[in-house]
UniProtKB/Swiss-Prot annotation:
Family: Belongs to the RGS7BP/RGS9BP family.
Biased composition (Basic and acidic residues): 174-186
GO terms under biological process: negative regulation of signal transduction
Keywords, sorted A to Z: Coiled coil, Signal transduction inhibitor
Location of the region described as Disordered in the Swiss-Prot/TrEMBL record: 1-37, 168-187
Known role: Regulator of G protein-coupled receptor (GPCR) signaling. Probably acts by regulating the activity of some 'R7' family protein (RGS6, RGS7, RGS9 and/or RGS11).
Protein name: Regulator of G-protein signaling 9-binding protein
Coiled coil: 70-92
Organism: Xenopus tropicalis (Western clawed frog)
InterPro entries, A to Z: RGS7BP/RGS9BP
Amino acid sequence: MAAPEVSSAGPNMLHPNSRTLTLRGKRGHAAEDSSQGAVSDCKKMHSSLNKVTACYRQLVLCVGGTSDCTRLREELEESRKKAFDLSTDLSNTLMVLLMNEGVSQEDRVELERIWVLFLSTLEFFQQDLCKAHHLCQLFPLHGRRKRLVNTGVIGKTSEVAYRARNIKSPSSSRMHENQQRTERPCSPDLAGQIEHMERMLHDMQMKVSIPIWTVEATEEAWAEVASTCDLDECSDNEILAGEDITSRGCCAHGQSLPGPLCMVS
């Protein structure tokens, strides 16, 4: 007669190899989540940089015009410093991620796309810096020898500067580490920042070589035009309404003038 089987009441123990595989799987998922979070932060930071540089470009158009003043020069300085901080943080973060071999292929493709767009943004921003430097030399506020040009730009520039100040900068632990590691203050001199921007573009292209023609677009053309703006929408609507009323002439103000005079005005 066969002996009865005795079941062990002890707990089920995992094999050491299976435990190692479990730990590796958890670490892999954690690294993947961290990489995806860094890519998302880079997207947000590049979007913020685009908005700040766009506001800076609008402010540069007013230099030397009838709306030029000390306040405009201060707003240019504030927008320039904010764009400098965003571009420096994004450049350091992208270089660290692109030189990391542990980044997945999907995230690397997205990082390369952000990298190419970022280079284009920096080139446009550098052109605006050169334009602002040239106009500020032509039309100095103190000891002015030349009269301001009637460029047709009227109204205040505070709305544009307000939008630039309210643009939020995405922050993460990785970006703070890179900022502390390579912290460089913004040059108070406009010519100094132009030189710094040239060095930044040169270093980026030398350290990370990404052929532009290998990067494919993932969005439709002019998709940003149809997108909704989440910054100061009420202020933008008021500005557009004010421009619409101004463009209508005397008829919008309830003045009853003859037809020919109204057309001339």
